[in-house]
């Protein structure tokens, strides 16, 4: 039963940056002994609110009330000392220091200027035991797993007697076992009467942990769900994006042109048997398969990231010799890779540079001078047309959300003369609203005659977007399904590895 008095309240919180209104009039309550989830599209304002709570940002308007008192923190240390801790996706620890030193950093027990290591390790050991972990407090942090690092962050919060602990996308780098352990710890913290704020785009986690869910959209408060028996996936999606779940994919039948892409018995590292398939102009073909099916490996080979070891790739009936990515680009074939941060973007360069970097060679002045006028116009055009949310074209792309990074990569290829686009997990790690925008870009490309081949491990996405689904299993094609006839049972049946029958 919900308590009558909230422990944490946000009252009319607003935050404005130069040219950007990040939060507007955010008001809601959180109660002790509850996990309160914050949901919304990337850029909805969840992380900004946590940074205000933790003292990273000062609110432009409004106030934070903790246990009946209006609070204002000058920095994160002040917030932590007041019992507010944020566990970020990027953990803020010192690898060369021991577990105990990290837990009590800034308040190491000492006498006469000398650290009392015996007391330090004893106190740290108590915090570790509290979390049910078996870690030597004298171990240098660099020898621990990411999941153990996270436990050290939580122990650090408990050492400051934190009553409010917020988790910002905490499972993004964890194994299944580490996620289970994190959930166990969060449930224990809830039992102890702490306020737990939990930010994640993974709905299965939200439903597994939450006692209440607050939804944000475009920096504004939308709704708080408090009866978890009455809320489902569709209701959350509708609250986040302002439309029904049935509208998310938006597939419609369309006509196709001539064959644009053909693979003839193509093999590449990680592809077990020769792959043959064709994609027509204006057609969207989805590649579905479980982990290890060979989807990404096939695309990397097609794009020249790895070497095709057998077979031939054809574009518009012409054989293409692809030994490196520049050969594929020249032929009109582009790739949005699975790991966009490592392989798709140049993190320390601007949005403008990331959009223009491929087509730049065609627009240099006198063969050697960058055409700044063209680059500025081209970047601004794609920022507007793709609705890339950024303060400006000169913003570093690493500061954008995953969905906006992906749209910038698409803008890069839209600057080229594209015939074929390969999309490898194009919406992984992207919120629902940004996914919808990516789907619309895919449909627009198909309408322009581009052949679209996209790989995804999200089966509802493949079934919802593709005109035709090619199912891969252990490096080979297991079957094909048409959009109108395909269902999850058929696709999974084809994707599951064959089980050899033992003779009794």
Swiss-Prot record:
InterPro entries: AAA+_ATPase, ABC_carbohydrate_import_ATPase, ABC_transporter-like_ATP-bd, ABC_transporter-like_CS, P-loop_NTPase. Residues 8-243, 256-499 form the ABC transporter domain. GO terms for molecular function: ABC-type L-arabinose transporter activity; ATP binding; ATP hydrolysis activity. Pfam families: ABC_tran. Keywords: ATP-binding, Cell inner membrane, Cell membrane, Membrane, Nucleotide-binding, Repeat, Sugar transport, Translocase, Transport. Part of the ABC transporter complex AraFGH involved in arabinose import. Responsible for energy coupling to the transport system. This is Arabinose import ATP-binding protein AraG.
């Amino acid at each position: 039963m919900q308590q009558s008095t909230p422990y944490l309240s946000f009252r009319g919180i607003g935050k404005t940056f130069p040219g950007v209104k990040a939060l507007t009039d955010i008001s809601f309550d959180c109660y002790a002994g509850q996990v309160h989830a914050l949901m919304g599209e990337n850029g909805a304002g969840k992380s900004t609110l946590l940074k205000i709570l933790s003292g990273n940002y000062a609110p432009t308007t409004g106030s934070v009330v903790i246990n009946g008192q209006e609070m204002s923190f000058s920095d994160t240390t002040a917030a932590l000392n007041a019992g507010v801790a944020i566990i970020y996706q990027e953990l803020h620890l010192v690898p060369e220091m021991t577990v105990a030193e990290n837990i009590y950093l800034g308040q190491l027990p000492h006498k006469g200027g000398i650290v009392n290591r015996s007391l330090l390790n004893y106190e740290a050991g108590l915090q570790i035991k509290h979390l049910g972990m078996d870690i030597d407090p004298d171990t240098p942090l660099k020898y621990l797993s990411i999941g153990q690092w996270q436990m050290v962050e939580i122990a650090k919060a408990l050492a400051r007697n934190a009553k409010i602990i917020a988790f910002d996308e905490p499972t993004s780098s964890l194994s299944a076992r580490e996620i289970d352990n994190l959930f166990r710890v969060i449930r224990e913290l809830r039992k102890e009467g702490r306020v737990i704020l939990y930010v994640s785009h993974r709905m299965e986690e939200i439903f597994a942990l939450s006692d209440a869910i607050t939804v944000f959209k475009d920096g504004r408060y939308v709704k708080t769900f408090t009866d978890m028996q009455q809320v489902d996936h569709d209701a959350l999606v509708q609250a986040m994006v302002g439309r029904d779940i049935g509208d998310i994919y938006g597939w419609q039948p369309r006509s196709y042109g001539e064959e644009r892409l053909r693979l003839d018995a193509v093999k590449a590292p990680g592809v077990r048997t020769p792959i043959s398939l064709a994609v027509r102009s204006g057609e969207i073909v989805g590649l579905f398969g479980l982990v290890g099916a060979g989807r990404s490996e096939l695309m990397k080979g097609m794009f020249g990231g790895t070497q095709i070891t057998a077979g031939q790739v054809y574009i518009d009936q012409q054989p293409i010799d692809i030994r490196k990515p520049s050969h594929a680009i020249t032929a009109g074939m582009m790739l949005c890779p699975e790991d966009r941060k490592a392989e798709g973007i140049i993190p320390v360069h601007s949005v403008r540079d990331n959009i223009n970097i491929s087509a730049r060679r065609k627009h240099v002045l006198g063969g050697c001078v960058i055409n700044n006028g063209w680059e500025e116009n081209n970047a601004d055009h794609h920022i507007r047309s793709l609705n890339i949310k950024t303060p400006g074209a000169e913003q570093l792309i690493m500061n954008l959300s995953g969905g906006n990074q992906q749209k910038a990569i698409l803008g890069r290829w839209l600057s080229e003369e594209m015939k074929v686009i390969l999309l490898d997990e194009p919406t992984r790690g992207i919120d629902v609203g940004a996914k919808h925008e990516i789907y619309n870009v895919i449909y627009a490309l198909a309408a322009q005659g581009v052949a679209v081949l996209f790989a995804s491990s999200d089966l509802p996405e493949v079934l919802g977007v593709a005109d035709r689904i090619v199912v891969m299993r252990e490096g080979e094609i297991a079957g094909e399904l048409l959009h109108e006839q395909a269902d999850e049972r058929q696709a999974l049946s084809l994707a599951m590895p064959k089980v050899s029958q033992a003779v009794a």
